[in-house]
């Protein structure tokens, strides 16, 4: 199951090593001198955490990839930004929703 989670490897200037991260387990990380070792290290740490959670009857987090998404979310912005976006959408002959969707996709 640990292969279904969302992993990232990035450089840690503070540690001067690559750090492996798992988005669903934000408290876990693994440092290594090369990216491949950081990736395999964090996957092993997550695997061990899952084994431990299941042994203690804890529910592991649902992988981001397995979650259902509605395609809708609410964003609060300043009224001036809202106005500017409406004007920009009108100038482009598209709906506000289409404009914002396009901007977010970039």
Residue ranges and their predicted role:
Residues 1-21, 25:
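N-terminal segment of the canonical double-stranded RNA-binding domain
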Residues 1-6, 43-106:
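Short, charged, surface-exposed hinge/linker loops at domain edges
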